[in-house]
Amino acid sequence: MSGVAQGSYLVAGPAVGVVMSTHDQTQLMASQTATLFTDTTAGTNNIVVDEGQVYQTIEGFGAAFTDSAAYLLEQVEPSASQAGTLNDLFTRTGNGIGLSFMRVPIGATDIARSLYSFDDNSGQADPTLTNFSITHDQGYILPLILQAKALNPQMKLLASPWSPPAWMKSTASMNSGTLLSSDYTQFANYLVKYLQAYKAAGVTYDYLTIQNEPLNQTTAYPSMYMDAPTELAVTRDYVLPALTTANLTTKLFVYDHNWDTPAYPTTVLTDPTIMASPLIAGTAWHGYAGPVGSQQTVQNAFPTMGAWETEHSGGTWQTDQFTTDFLEITQVMRNAAKSFVKWSLALDQTLGPNLTELNNGLGGCATCTPIVTVNSATGIVTKDVEYYTLGHYSKYVMPGATRIYSSNTSAVVSVAFKNPDGSKALVAFNNSSASQTLQVQWGTQLFSYSLPSLAAATFTWTGTQMGTPTVSATWQIQGSSYSSESGLEMETTGDSTGGYDLGYVNPGAYAVYKNVNFGNGVSGVSVRTASGGQGGSLEFHLDSISGPLVSTATLPITGGWQTWTTVTASATGASGVHDLYIVFRGTTAGISNVNWFQFN
């Protein structure tokens, strides 16, 4: 396996730095020969980058300081090698990948060496929290966080409880159950005391969620059910006032669970007190169920709120973690996320320690995979594939970067960023079985690069964009290459070319493609579509949702949402450069999926 490319590999002028990882893992974040921007004529397999189209600000990429991860890195790895490991994880020097958004559990999770909270009190109620103590964390969790923050001062920290103390719950257990209404005040004070104790120890939290995965309750490990109305009430009436009284500036994310239930954060954020609070930052999302497009849907509904992806573990259940990561992280970033956070930062060679290993009826994830593995016998640290997949983003996308527009091709998906210093980073993944020679068009400049099958590359460069790029209407324009959308969601496609398609389409949904060049005119359009629903039609309008109608294509029922066919329609009245609006028409939700369209 190759090592990470040294430094950030940014070269002044038109030179483009390249680091690449291959699917067979013979190269992992390995430096390639730099390429150059030229002024040659654009081809048809283009990724268009336009820093004039700006999206969300990025805060970072990371994982979780679980109890097990901290124990392994602080207590098991030999002290002589710890500095090197932490440099690799938290700085961008040498092989470092610069993790800059880290999550910290408040108490035990399933990835822990024991069950604990910070006021267990032998199971007896302690309403004044007299026995509250973070002594457990002072052994190895706090020291690790302090070292990481010293190495990366820009690091953002998020705190999340899996369960409050058992005496606050209906089950009198840290596993399963609900929060007793009589202990709402005590719960809010518990969270405040945790934040205060950490602050006194030198760690200030940027963000807090009040419950990890509130719709998941299990008897196997710490968890607690909290429906949306309860989270709203606890947040609005107890936690926010407690934070204000304590003069804490830590901001709250709502929800902290999967993409499959966007109604949950919608319920919480609809409340006017929540929306007006300066301490509410937005929504935390997990990636274990549902379409990632839920992030963008909620973002569109609450544009002043942010979106953060705060957990999605790799695991032995994944048959191809390499491909899964590049498709997902790219898609998450293209759907408004300010962060992408894996699960446990470190585990041992048996994917522990975890509660399952205690053999006392507890369970949890014994198949989750880490960023690095620490051998429990030797202390030797090994970088896992997720170190490199995450590193393709975290090393080159700085905190404070903004996502900028980039398009996808039929086989290559991408996401682009502009760093605070003006440098650019483009991550591209070839999701096909063949090598792809692609052209990256930045303004009026281009470079070409051959990307092997199922390989990923991060391209970095500096300079000022010259001109505004246009997209030829006669190229195959991917549905997922929209500049903005309403009423639909991006998803991984099952079509033969790979990549993403547009799905979950409601009547009246639309997507916008800026700066489409129709040249001297077009006469027809082809649309790649699949429908397991009612079908409908797709209208092509110029410059607005109700602008001049260029074409209407029928979207037939194909027998399945991933059963693809290509339909054609005539087109007229379009020439020159326009913003193109595609508008879905139908009678019911679930009209049709669209992979691409192409004018002729």
Give names to the regions the model predicted.
Residues 63, 98, 157, 208, ...:
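Conserved, mostly hydrophobic/aromatic
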Residues 395, 406-443, 454:
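Carbohydrate-binding surface patches
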Residues 306-389, 405-408:
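Aromatic/acidic polysaccharide-binding cleft in carbohydrate-active enzymes
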Residues 186-207, 214-315:
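Active-site neighborhood of glycoside hydrolase catalytic domains
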Residues 344, 373, 377-402, 462-496:
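Catalytic cores of secreted or luminal carbohydrate-active enzymes
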Residues 3, 465-600:
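Extracytoplasmic
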Residues 25-205, 237:
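N-terminal catalytic cores of secreted or lumenal carbohydrate-active enzymes
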Residues 433-461, 536-542:
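Beta-strand-rich binding/interaction modules
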